[in-house]
Amino acid sequence: MIIGIGSDLIDIRRVEKSIERFGERFTHRCFTEVERARSDRRANRAASYAKRFAAKEACSKALGTGIAQGVFWKDMGVVNLPSGKPTMQLTGTAAVLLEAILPAGHRAAIHLTITDDYPLAQAFVIIEALPESP
């Protein structure tokens, strides 16, 4: 069953300006080490960061909090499954909130899609509760 849905649309130019103005202070504050390593290898670095920023916003909305209630940017990170499919890895308060909305006897599957078409980047997150195997 679906227990959370979130979406976000961001202007890549806004992220470009943040990177230009704050540099590593911005990227280290908002992104995990895995996200920074992946984005810094990209030809269009700002678009890669923007997609990940949008994914965090969408995930926080799917959790029902937004960036509030002790949820920090680095509590949510975009990671890839072995198949290459993106998903979200939650830690800290975000992980606690996810556990709180999960029905008993269920585990979470976080579905993520991210895309960009300059000057916009977009993300959708669906949090699904799946019955645990016996």
Swiss-Prot record:
InterPro entries for the chain: 4-PPantetheinyl_Trfase_dom, 4-PPantetheinyl_Trfase_dom_sf, ACPS, Ppantetheine-prot_Trfase_dom
Residues holding Mg(2+): 8, 57
Pfam families: ACPS
Organism superkingdom: Bacteria
Locations listed in the record: Cytoplasm
Bilayer-spanning residue ranges: none
Enzyme Commission designation: 2.7.8.7
Keyword Nucleus on entry: no
UniProt cofactor(s): Mg(2+)
Key words of the record: Cytoplasm, Fatty acid biosynthesis, Fatty acid metabolism, Lipid biosynthesis, Lipid metabolism, Magnesium, Metal-binding, Transferase
Known catalytic reactions: apo-[ACP] + CoA = holo-[ACP] + adenosine 3',5'-bisphosphate + H(+)
GO biological process, one term: fatty acid biosynthetic process
Matches recorded under Gene3D superfamilies: 4'-phosphopantetheinyl transferase domain (3.90.470.20)
GO CC terms in record: cytoplasm
Family note: Belongs to the P-Pant transferase superfamily. AcpS family.
Known function: Transfers the 4'-phosphopantetheine moiety from coenzyme A to a Ser of acyl-carrier-protein.
Protein name: Holo-[acyl-carrier-protein] synthase
Organism ancestry: Bacteria, Pseudomonadati, Pseudomonadota, Alphaproteobacteria, Hyphomicrobiales
Gene behind the chain: acpS
